[in-house]
């Protein structure tokens, strides 16, 4: 047949046909025997048709469709057999011959590798070259496939590759999702690329050549680079352990992330480059030849565990040399004197940042240095992100000794116990932010309680004129902003807002009155630590009071009060890790105040007074989620105060208004509140000191039984400054 066609129909047959640029169609019931297909020749075997002993030469093509069959086809170099869900058996595939099919077909025959077959959705020992291809369909599998030059292995999601899948130079692996349960073997492939998801329990081996992978890659059996192979991970999310031979290269580029160890073998170790936004997570001990960071990151941090879990273990990275610029994110557990280490056996050059995470647990031997970097030689510079690392109670700093870098507990002369000629001062140690937050929170109940337990005037307003039989109810809102520096911590700001309400019964005595009552309170207290973090204290309280005042202006007021503090400690370690610890605490206290009101003239009065306040919060064990533990001893406060109020009685539009000024001085005597951190270090929260108080207020008698008041004050002392404290309230008599 020369450029014509031949149709073989039912019961028809064709024998020894030669097709030169023409076409032979074998339909149902027809048969063709000993057909020779030359260049541009074409044989179609349709459903029900059959072809036997066909020879396909260069440029020829035999197509077997669903329901059609071919037996004893010989494919010579340049020829192609295409089987589309049909059957082709006893095939002889000579070198350079191409087979195009999928795993829904039935095939058997021999090739340069030996016997091959496709049956029941399983392809075995297929050879795809010179335009040949195999599509592995969903639920099917292909084992021991070899993809030669210009061959294609297509994989549909849900199918599996088994055995050894070999991809030679100029071959192609195609598929959005490829599951490999065997060994995917790239052999001297000069420019292989794969874009998609490669997953499975198998392994990937590259011998020589260059490959580039994009998308996602997960191979439980790992990756092996050998014989000068060069692999580039380009925008790839990869999870696999990598073994590199000497002379190979692995490059992470364009934001790639590799999770897994990289190690050498008995030939040595290959080189590795991490570029740009790419990150390498070595989750096991690793060894590379030359390590180059081009603004890349090596992150030792485990992705599925934290440094506080029992499975935490240190990881070492050994490199023959180091160059470039980049970051190393590392874990340490200084408490057990272990941590990740970067070991450069040869020359190191460039600038690198160490971002080190540690725990809040206390080192057994404080101040003992922990090595994090070793270099054999070179001028590499390492700096510590944030300048410090938290280790229990104390901060650690990065110190260079020769070509090694250590974490040490003080900045001036790390590790020096005694001053010497070159170190005239003792070592300086600095507490961590976690320790500071614990020390801050230990004093907070004192300031919360004392702010709630304000003077008699805050509770009753103008009590002598506004408290009468048989009694009444009252309430007030209070708010304050306090800056506290007392104690062993770095200090904090305390913002308080809350309500207090109560009621009393007033007894008329011969020359005096006695008010006996009860009250409840709640305040919300926000704490901003000076070194970072925002904690809260919710304070719920209640108490009893009794106030006596006679007709000559004398008064005595006593209060007892209990509180329940709900503490939520929140801060951040020096590496930015959030830290928290929640606990409850009980406290109780009271105050006793006495004074007298003198009339200076018909409308002006003065009221000197003295006051004492005492408070005690229970001891408490505190645990933070970074491993720090603390025991706050019983926190005590004892204050004495003397002051004077000066006011006037005015009548405005029929309403009695009493503006007043107040000034006082108080002294805190408590100087020995103890806190023990990590069962090792004792701190004293000394909150003693003198404070001056200044304020102004006004009360107004709206009706015979109802009054309101407001007061604002300022106080400043050695340990506290309150730029503004305000209170507004009311009282209604029965």
Label each PLM-derived region with a short phrase.
Residues 1-77:
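Thr-biased low-complexity repeat/linker tracts and other Thr-enriched repetitive architectures
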Residues 214, 345, 464, 495, ...:
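Transmembrane beta-barrel domains of outer membrane proteins
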Residues 363-378, 489-507, 630-637:
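Short secondary-structure subsegments characteristic of cysteine-rich extracellular domains
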